[in-house]
UniProtKB/Swiss-Prot annotation:
TECPR repeats, residue ranges: 210-239, 254-285, 301-332, 344-376, 739-766, 962-991, 1007-1037, 1053-1083, 1095-1135
Keywords of the record: Autophagy, Cytoplasmic vesicle, Lipid-binding, Lysosome, Membrane, Repeat
Polar residues bias (residue ranges): 413-430, 486-495
Cellular compartments annotated: Cytoplasmic vesicle, Autophagosome membrane; Lysosome membrane
Name of the molecule in the record: Tectonin beta-propeller repeat-containing protein 1
Free-text note regarding domains: The PH domain mediates the binding to phosphatidylinositol-3-phosphate (PtdIns(3)P).
Domain named PH: residues: 618-727
Coiled-coil residue spans: none
Region of interest (Disordered), ranges: 413-495, 1147-1173
Cited Gene3D superfamilies: Pleckstrin-homology domain (PH domain)/Phosphotyrosine-binding domain (PTB) (2.30.29.30)
GO cellular-component term (any): cytoplasmic vesicle
Amino acid sequence: MSSSLLWAVDIFGRVYTLSTVGQYWELCKDTQLEFKRVSAVKQCCWGIACDHQVYTYVFSGDVPIRYQEETYENQRWNPVGGFCEKLMPSDRWQWSDVSGLKHQQLDSFTLPSPHWEWESDWYVDENIGGEPTEKGGWTYAIDFPSTYTKDKKWNSCVRRRRWIRYRRYKSRDVWAKITSHDDPERLPDPFNDISIGGWEITDEPLGRLSVWAVSLQGRVWYRENVCHHNPEGSTWSLISTPGEVAQISCGSYDLLWATLWEGQAIVREGIDRNNPQGISWSTVESPSSDNGIMHVSVGVDVVWCITKDRKVWFRRGVNSHNPCGTSWIEMVGEMMMVNVGLNNQVWGIGCDDRTIYFRQGVTPSELSGKMWKAIVCGRESDRSQTGSSTSLLSAGCFFTDDIQNQTNTVIQGDADTSSDTELSSIPTNLSSTPPMGAAASSASSTGSQAAGAPASVTVDPLDSDQGEAPAASASDEKAHLESRKSTNPTPSTELQWTNIDLKEAHRHAVLSVSTFTETSSLSSLGMFSVGAEEQYGADEHPLWAWVSGGGCLVDLHSPLKWFAVPSGLSSSVQSLSLSITPAQTAAWRKQIFQQLSERTKRELENFRHYEQAVEQSVWVKTGMLQWWRNWKPHKWMDVRVALEQFTGSDGMRDSILFIYYMYHEEKKYIHVFLNEVTIIAEVLKEGKHSFALYTPERTKQRWPICLAATTEQEMHDWLSLLTMSCCESRRIQGPPSHHAIWSVSCKGDIFVSEPSPELEAEPHPMPCDQMFWRQVGGHLRLVECNNRGIVWGIGYDHTVWVYTGGYGGGFIQGLASSADNIYTQSDVKCVYIYENQRWNPVTGYSSRGLPTDRYMWSDASGLQECTKANTKPPSPQWSWVSDWYIDFSTSGGTDREGWQYAADFPASYHGHKTMKDFVRRRRWARKCKIVTNGPWLEVPPVTLWDISIIPSSDADDEESVALWAISDKGDVLCRLGVTQQNPAGTSWLHVGTDQPFVSISVGAFFQVWAVARDGSAFYRGSVSPKKPAGDCWYHIPSPQKQKLKQVSVGRTSVFVLDKNGNLWYRQGITPSYPQGSAWDHVSNNIRKMSVGPLDQVWVIADKVQGSHGLSCGTVCHRTGVQPMEPKGLAWDYGIGGGWEHVTVRGNASQAPRGTVPSESPPEPMESEGRVMC
């Protein structure tokens, strides 16, 4: 589970955060302000301070928040002076925006607030549509406005160039005051409540948020233009309401509720991506006629409220179509306030004890949950103040009496010397508020005595009554220690201490077991300074005033650490233990494992000369499955399957799979030797729990053996057994090697193959259809690796994962999977369907099409009917996590309602309607989620689109490895601190660009190439281990009339892939001129490609001929790649179709030397280097 934060404010106005993977409340870094309320999302938090002003807290990150300012310089040609600044009266401004209608001089741009700073000065953009311009950046046209080109022609009468400048948001990890530039007469009065949400309404612009606020006069305000590139927003807009509003709550989508001072609730209707402020209000009455609503909180499709008698209510029937819901249901408990966060999870603050409670059991099927459970986490300051004391206490419990007695005198002496320590003053402003909840049970006898504490006292570490701490001299304290010893005369009841790791030994003394178990007071464990800013007692829990979970993602599959308190230990020391470092633990476990391994070998060697009692053993597993038969008509038929395993005299275990079927009432069978199977993979076929077995021959035919089980568990049992049998037959065990080739199927399944040295041998390389692929647990969209064993992956939701060195996971369990380094992994992706309509002169666009038209609800091709009701998740492992929504990010653009228009089906679609458009479509999306496990750990917090690791490196294990990436926003990043011991690295280094990028690759000698979103190519200069980010970008012209989408760099070769599936090779690359000179076409029908450390080329190809038709998504290997023939000669076809990604960047194993050349060169598999269609 990735880390996210729960925000809370205590009664003193201090802001705390609690991580979903932590156990302690951490005080906000910026503690200069006191707050009343906060509202948080993942990327930021907004709050109202005690001065009633609005502040925002933006998290720091490796990727800066940058905004690009641009203006255009326009010139016209005249016969006297040529191009000059003098324009015609009808022309646009000399300095203008892109349309020419707005006057924009360079000095007219100012920073929007003190929280921004300029990143650089103005400079000219020398790029137009992915093509570099001449020096100076001018583009030419006949007149304003027109189509501009980079080439100057005889009729070019006007020209313009683009100036750009970046500003950077600098106030991160601090509370930044929201300044207003509005008319002073319309400035909002002081604020009383604030709520942020709406991030799921639209993703345009990126990171858009809806910020709603309530003023002291009961007016509602909306903050305009809050997004990722403008975290402060621009202006406040007043929203009219039917009454005076007391409090407001905004959900992640289109749900907005507010409470009136009269006790009713009002609901905002008409909120959508085109109108985020909504249209009108509807009124909802209070669930109780006697007590009105005082607080409300909304989620995606839930509403919770608190009435004035502190009762908790849940609103039934709330959704986007009915935001008002249907009825109220009373919940158990009394709360001051509640807050609904991500996934509709609920938090509340108890009415009596001011403790934060978490609503357990909230699921998509049970939105109201089951029970309230208190969060019992302590504060981070408590852990830091008692770290050494607690480690001593924990350590003392594990040592024998001899060791304890040896240190007894030392501890007593240290206790005497610690008596001179004085503590700071203890605040007395909590005297009227006794401890509540869990704190009350442990300190009920002491809480009320804190009021009499003087301003400067000396606290006795052995006194369980922490409130009684009279000032005393050193002699008085010694006497008090002796008196405490006399009250505990029994040695057996004394918990002795040890002097191991004594960082603050002088602060500790002998403590009785009875005293320790009966008190949770931190002062009973040792002295510590209570700072002047400390508002609570030593072990008192904070008293909370507000909580916000809008940025807290609670994973239902991962338990939280917020509730566990070990018995017998105080809450302040619950997570502290022996001061044994992880390195010591790892060395200890490694030593034990080594000793056990040596003993096993020693015992076996003494008996190897004995004769085997059984020379051969046979084991058979049978079952009933379905088989997709080979002959027409192809359909599923019931078969009996038997897996026979036998062990020969040489100890080798082999297996045969028999499939028995009936053909014309005659019993027949087919058999497969598992040592010939090249891959076993789960496939999607007609909604069955099916999997496929490939052999080299069936790989060539593109026609595997497909079997289906009745249940998912039965399918996984067979997959696990067959995979383990194949690995045993080939003597493959353990994690993949550093030279392994990784690939990902279109389902997101991860496979790995151990390359043979003959794979790149010339002139007779090993055919890649004979490669054996085994599955690795997890779910990813792409994987990248190098020859140092560093492997990174990116999921469909752009989450980044790093390989832990394990193997197995997923359905592969038991002996075929490693016990360590397997972790829970999740992924989210979208399922798309299309709504199609045709125009007719009577009703306009409607769902009534022609008989020859596609289905009115279909997939992208239109050949398969896909409605909202019958569309299922990709497999039973997936579950829906959202409802259907219109996708406005479809390629080609959409109108305000998401429609795309075309002349007919199928055709090229565009986002605006013309007179010739008789059909239209729009895409609907729904998110689904899979939870599995595998040898992967998440690398937070940046989400990525592409990644590249230097394919080979001669550096030491401790030296850093070059790793470059593209974020999902298009930022270029360089990872620092990546080593073989720490493959996850330490931090990101942002590399500035003038536009978003989509692909990047780093070669074996630190050559960094990238592709921008507009299809242009760039080369990064001066990249080296001492200068990992390089110095500048060089614009490389793309192949003529082609837009690039991927680049891959090997040792000396650079290949790119354009959006039409053409593969290109960069010619003329030399150490003195690394940019190269020209592009040379290699092949077509390519989907993805990867260039290895030896310049070997592997691709995912489409339209590969098989025995039953064309296959898409086939792994192919380029043969004949030599220094004198870097483009290679032909394609060798491997596993597929249905593959999405392959990487060969870890395979640095050289082919064996001394091969005898054949008399004639092998005939290429295709002409002109093209994949066969």
